[in-house]
């Protein structure tokens, strides 16, 4: 029997922000949204990609002849890495191997459920002493539903606490199947207004809110996460719309409150490495005073709220 594989782009250990206790984060590649502030753009496409660090490149051209896909090209003494029109990286990593200056990195790796579970199990002592476990994120983990559900089920069979970070944009049957094996959903609500949500992410939010309602009404543990940007979703009206939507579930034991995730620029450099333009102009980061205002606004409606600073 061939074991299901997942396309992963990172595994992060000793995380303290994305679920209770010390956690291992497994990042699944591929996402149906295109959030303008995305800090993991290398997780958006469900395919191999090349990150090119121009400042490290010595322009030796060693990557060009070893690439079977023609991703690396040279013409008129100009090297181009990973951006060749019509070429797609196949994940062979030969360019990585021959690059003398570590200027190239292939993003994406196929891992079996057994391989992932082995990595997750390495930190069991930390989970047991801290109440931690594993969190699956991305990208969007539910874009690889079979692999995600198989890994979640395997973790539960091994007594490991499970959480997923999700944008909620998935078929409801996928959410229902995953929910059997999830101890906590870290559920993004990027904007409560569907038209505005479309402008910011490329999709409307009706499916997202429908899945959220199903999870809350069926007693699955949910913590709402709001990526917070100044002038985008931090107004009194924006926040009131969010809490009014959540008000029917305010006293549910499975509703675990609201996390605010302030905008940051930690992923900006990766856009250039992918050959992409950064979608946001200006700086929508909130000041400490802005964050205090937003917190106070939510608290006045008697909702538990925390600011998560990465």
Curated annotation (Swiss-Prot):
List residues binding [4Fe-4S] cluster 1. Answer: 31, 35, 38
GO biological process, alphabetically ordered = choline catabolic process
Give the top-rank taxon of the lineage listed in the UniProt record for this protein.
Bacteria
Q: What's its EC?
A: 1.97.1.-
Q: Which residues bind S-adenosyl-L-methionine?
A: 37-39, 139, 188-190, 264
* Keyword terms, alphabetized: 4Fe-4S, Iron, Iron-sulfur, Metal-binding, Oxidoreductase, Repeat, S-adenosyl-L-methionine
Q: What pairs make up the disulfide bonds?
A: none
Q: Which residues form the 4Fe-4S ferredoxin-type domain?
A: 48-77, 79-109
User: Which residues are listed for [4Fe-4S] cluster 2 binding in this entry?
Assistant: 57, 60, 63, 99
Q: Gene3D superfamilies per the record?
A: 3.30.70.20, Aldolase class I
Q: Which reaction does it catalyse?
A: glycyl-[protein] + reduced [flavodoxin] + S-adenosyl-L-methionine = glycin-2-yl radical-[protein] + semiquinone [flavodoxin] + 5'-deoxyadenosine + L-methionine + H(+)
Known pathway: Amine and polyamine metabolism; choline degradation
Q: Which residues form a coiled coil?
A: none
Q: Which cofactors does this protein require?
A: [4Fe-4S] cluster
| All residue ranges annotated as the Radical SAM core domain in the record | 17-304
Q: Which GO terms describe its molecular function?
A: 4 iron, 4 sulfur cluster binding; glycyl-radical enzyme activating activity; metal ion binding; S-adenosyl-L-methionine binding
**InterPro entries named in the record:** 4Fe4S_Fe-S-bd, 4Fe4S_Fe_S_CS, Aldolase_TIM, BssD/PflA/YjjW, CutC_activ_rSAM, Organic_radical-activating, Organic_radical_activase, Radical_activat_CS
The similarity comment for this entry is: Belongs to the organic radical-activating enzymes family.
Query: What the protein does?
Result: Catalyzes activation of the choline trimethylamine-lyase CutC under anaerobic conditions by generation of an organic free radical on a glycine residue, via a homolytic cleavage of S-adenosyl-L-methionine (SAM). Is involved in the anaerobic choline utilization pathway that allows D.alaskensis to grow on choline as a source of carbon and energy.
How would you summarize the oligomeric state and partners of this protein? Monomer.
What protein does this entry describe?
Answer: Choline trimethylamine-lyase activating enzyme
Organism lineage reads as: Bacteria, Pseudomonadati, Thermodesulfobacteriota, Desulfovibrionia, Desulfovibrionales
């Amino acid at each position: 029997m061939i074991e299901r594989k997942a396309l992963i782009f990172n595994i992060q250990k000793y995380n303290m922000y994305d679920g209770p206790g010390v956690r291992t984060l497994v990042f699944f590649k591929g996402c149906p949204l295109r959030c303008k502030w995305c800090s993991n753009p290398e997780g958006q496409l469900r395919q191999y990609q090349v990150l090119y660090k121009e400042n490290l490149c010595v322009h030796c051209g060693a990557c060009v002849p070893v690439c079977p896909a023609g991703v690396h090209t040279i013409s008129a003494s100009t090297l181009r890495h990973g951006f060749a029109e019509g070429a797609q990286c196949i994940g062979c990593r030969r360019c990585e191997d021959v690059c003398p200056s570590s200027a190239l990195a292939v993003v994406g790796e196929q891992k079996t459920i057994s391989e992932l579970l082995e990595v997750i199990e390495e930190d069991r002592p930390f989970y047991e002493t801290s109440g931690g476990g594993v969190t699956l994120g991305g990208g969007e983990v539910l874009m690889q539903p079979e692999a995600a559900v198989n890994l979640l089920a395997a973790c539960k069979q091994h007594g490991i606490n499970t959480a997923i970070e999700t944008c909620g944009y998935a078929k409801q049957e996928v959410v229902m199947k995953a929910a059997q094996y999830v101890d906590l959903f870290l559920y993004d609500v990027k904007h409560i207004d569907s038209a505005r949500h479309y402008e910011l992410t490329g999709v409307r939010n009706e499916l997202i809110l429908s899945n959220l309602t199903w999870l809350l009404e069926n007693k699955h543990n949910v913590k709402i996460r709001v990526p917070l940007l100044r002038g985008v979703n931090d107004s009194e009206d924006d926040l009131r719309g969010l809490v009014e939507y959540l008000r029917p579930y305010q006293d549910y034991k499975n509703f675990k409150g609201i996390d605010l995730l302030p905008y940051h620029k930690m992923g900006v450099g990766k856009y250039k490495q992918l050959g992409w333009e950064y979608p946001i102009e200006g700086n929508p980061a909130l000041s400490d005073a802005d964050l205090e205002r937003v917190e106070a606004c939510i608290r006045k409606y008697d909702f538990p709220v925390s600011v998560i600073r990465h």
